[in-house]
Amino acid sequence: MQSTNDIRRSFLDYFTGAGHAEIASAPLVPYNDPTLMFVNAGMVPFKNVFTGLETPPAPTATSSQKCVRAGGKHNDLDNVGYTARHHTFFEMLGNFSFGDYFKEQAIEHAWTLLTREWGIDAARLTATVYHTDDEAYDFWRKIAGLPEERIIRIATKDNFWAMGDDGPCGPCSEIFFDHGDHIFGGPPGSPEEDGDRFVEVWNLVFMQHEQTGGEITGDLPNKNIDTGMGLERIAAVMQGVHDNYDTDTFKELIGASEGLTGVKAEGDQAASHRVIADHLRSTSFLIADGVLPSSEGRGYVLRRIMRRAMRHAHLLGASEPLMHRLVPALVTEMGQAYPELTRGQALIEETLEREEARFRQTLEKGLRLLDDATGDMSEGDTLDGETAFKLYDTYGFPYDLTEDALRPRGIAVDETGFASAMQRQKDAARAAWKGSGQAADSEVWFDIAEREGATEFTGYTSTSGEGRVVALVKNGKEVDSASAGDEVVILTNQTPFYGESGGQTGDAGTMSTPDGVKVEVTDTGKPLGRLHTHQAKIQSGTVLKGDTLHLDVDVDRRDRVRANHSATHLVHAALRNRLGEHVTQKGSLVAEDRLRFDFSHPKPLSEDDIAAIEAEVNEEIRANETVTTRLMSPDDAVDAGALALFGEKYGEEVRVLSMGRRSKEGRNYSVELCGGTHVRATGDIQLFRIISESAVSSGVRRIEALTGDAARQWLVRREEALKSAASALRTNPEEVAERVAALLDERKALEKELADARKQLALGGGGSQVAQSQDETIGDVTFSGQVINGLNPKDLRGLLDEAKQRMGSGIAAICAVNEGKAAFAAAVTDDLTDRYNAVDLVRAGVEVLGGKGGGGRPDMAQGGGPDGLKAEAALNAVRERLASAAA
């Protein structure tokens, strides 16, 4: 029996043996395609090739492409675990022809591989063709010798492919495998076609037409082939099983899940193990390709998949995080074919464990709420949308997780009600996917790229040069000219201006002509990853399409930018040396005045970590080693030890930047794939200083730093501030910390003395005789009333207790004023509580102070108000209350 890994390899080997170029799988995050959340088909990386926007990598190609279908139009999430062939992650084997061979050879390749190379029984294969595609029908008869009843004409869109209403399109031919009459189902096109007996294993797309507005308008000048074969499906066929989850890779993953949970994949528990095995693959590959769980976009879909798997782990009795413990089994099965799994294993495990630990805190509460809400429900009932939304909003249960939890009981969820509740909650956590910011104006860039091709970048070796104006864009539309005062985007056939990409900001500078045209360039973009767009303002003259301009990059600004960019490479290496190889770049900003570097790490950096990283980078700067650049293939670069960024799409040739001193093994301190601009030697960076370290999101940290003169000025400002502080403290800068500590101790002691003095003042200062002299008689009652500024309100009751003890019989009231506000308290000795209530007296004073209420006991009460200026009036209110009672 061939393993799934063997089948993948034999497919690729067959087509490379037939002259196809083997193309590595693209990352799951689509490159420069805001219309897709994830790569969901083998042809996605070649979309721009098929539409003519990119040059083919070779005349013919083959690949095994990672795919995810768990969001948007193509969403298999709900069915995963309950059917034989639904997956969130799958591999699409494919062969492609870009204007080379067409139908006959595509069918011949498919038939040869299936029946001769792999030995699949030809009698169990059936082909479908589009109902008008006589050519494909005849080739199946000629090449495969299939009888007429096993070449089925299909008139539906299942056998006609189109990228959209406009662009290339063409008929399809699908190959089905018959799993046997012991399984329900009929051949394609029959009433029983939805059964599981006949399973599609390969789809051949013949791109031969051009369409506009959904109508075919003609034939393509170059006809293309796009085929797709699900690896999991063909593995089931070749391993003699009907269910994808019974193939070797899934059996290993399910076996690992059984081992950790102690629960066999039987009966009702089988679906849970399948969900865990499938979702382990999709979550691990997404994390390896740079996606992290979040509350929106791709990260939210990843979190949904994670939480669905975690709920099923809970159903199997797992009391601790489980998913991260299954990652080694996945790496063993698939790490050789996809090295990014091995490289990202630490981050994958860490992310899964942290997310599961967090979700478990609310999972049980949410499930209890769900059980309470549905306890009296029966099969066929519907859970209201409000409760489903509460589960989402309070406990982090996505709608589909609630659906999944109720599915075994046959209880539906009110989707409309859920949507209404979501709409009403304006600050709902989940944000709709809106694609990238380029989507709105991308059409004009596609038009220009198709007409002019990519901009030639000359800025690696020069900061000035000539460029011919190939397009002028104003307000999203092409124009023929731009005059003084106009703000316009200028595109030239070549430019030394770096376009913003890879975290590095675009260049600024000037354009000019000998006859007086002057243009200020404020920024440079890079839409589609191919064009360099100069954001410009015409200072004088008129720029016409076709003009030749002299282009000058602002060299001082470029030098500051490239110093910061090179510093990010050094800090990346230093972080990995200090913290471990799990550290990977998660984002960066390289501007002229600062740099920002985001990286994967589960906890804050200590002061020692920051100091060590900063020292290590500065040591490499002082070494002043030459920065070298080499061009090589991506595979050779990675083999040479270069760090490649997850999610980046690399062409046939990449730039490998090496900087810093060499190790004993001959490897430079930092070796990375990078298309940015860099210093000539590390000493050009001059100085590196970290100014902050913070969290970006769960598992991602951020360093902000300065280099060169910006770092020097920052240190000078700190030194000046220290000198100013030393002068004010009348000490040396070296003794500022010691002097400040002494002053703080002194202040603390003085504050204590002041508090004690205020208490003594409240008690009469000079003793009981002085205190008695402050007493007054109202009717037959002795009254002591005081206003004390700066007294802590918590000392009021203690002072009143002492006043009661001193007086023996009487009433005392104190108003403590702090920062304009007043605290008011009153006390009545026990012999007078039958005549006077402290609560009533306090309320009288509090009302004057602008407050409300006041509470306590008949012998002691307290309140307060915002108007401390009326403190004496508040005491007078008490005096009036006492005088009124005595009258």
Curated annotation (Swiss-Prot):
Q: Which PROSITE patterns match?
A: AA_TRNA_LIGASE_II_ALA (PS50860)
- Entry keywords, A to Z: Aminoacyl-tRNA synthetase, ATP-binding, Cytoplasm, Ligase, Metal-binding, Nucleotide-binding, Protein biosynthesis, RNA-binding, tRNA-binding, Zinc
Metal-binding is among the record's keywords? yes
Q: What class of enzyme is it?
A: ligase
Q: Which cofactor does it need?
A: Zn(2+)
The Swiss-Prot or TrEMBL record annotates one GO molecular function as: tRNA binding
Is ATP-binding tagged as a keyword? yes
**What GO cellular component term, any one, is given?**
cytosol
Q: Which Gene3D superfamilies match?
A: 2.40.30.130, 3.10.310.40, 3.30.54.20, 6.10.250.550, Bira Bifunctional Protein, Domain 2, Threonyl-trna Synthetase, Chain A, domain 2
Q: Which reaction does it catalyse?
A: tRNA(Ala) + L-alanine + ATP = L-alanyl-tRNA(Ala) + AMP + diphosphate
Q: What is its main location?
A: cytoplasm
Q: Which GO terms describe its biological process?
A: alanyl-tRNA aminoacylation; negative regulation of DNA-templated transcription
Q: Which free-text remark accompanies the cofactor?
A: Binds 1 zinc ion per subunit.
SMART domains, from UniProt? tRNA_SAD
Matching entries from InterPro entries are given as: aa-tRNA-synth_II/BPL/LPL, Ala-tRNA-lgiase_IIc, Ala-tRNA-ligase_IIc_anticod-bd, Ala-tRNA-synth_IIc_core, Ala-tRNA-synth_IIc_N, Ala-tRNA_ligase, Ala_tRNA_ligase_euk/bac, DHHA1_dom
Stated family: Belongs to the class-II aminoacyl-tRNA synthetase family.
Function statement: Catalyzes the attachment of alanine to tRNA(Ala) in a two-step reaction: alanine is first activated by ATP to form Ala-AMP and then transferred to the acceptor end of tRNA(Ala). Also edits incorrectly charged Ser-tRNA(Ala) and Gly-tRNA(Ala) via its editing domain.
Q: What is this protein called?
A: Alanine--tRNA ligase
Species annotation: Erythrobacter litoralis (strain HTCC2594)
